[in-house]
């Protein structure tokens, strides 16, 4: 990383208050759903891999080894599967936004990064996908610059 990039990062961070947080990751979650904008994609379900990371606005030292004190990823998987099976979705971007909305259902989640990839569409030649990084509306943690 160049010194100029580091200086920009430091400059951006100095005005933002530091609050304790930790991150939860869910990786390699594969769901089968009806997705795709093209007619030939509507005829059969496709496998999609979802990876996500949530920044949790909570001091991990205050959790006290209690499941009730943390954001549960178990229920999160069930909610994502329900959305995926509820209807046809045209775009990966739409699915990623809906996954982010599910994550923001817990008030402690302040930022979500979601990657969604179609696993079977190009016969193994390539894996198309998108990455979405979004902050909770009104959060002090602004979304990154693209």
Q: Would you name each region that the model predicts?
A:
Residues 2-146:
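N-terminal, polar/charged subdomain of small-to-medium soluble alpha/beta proteins
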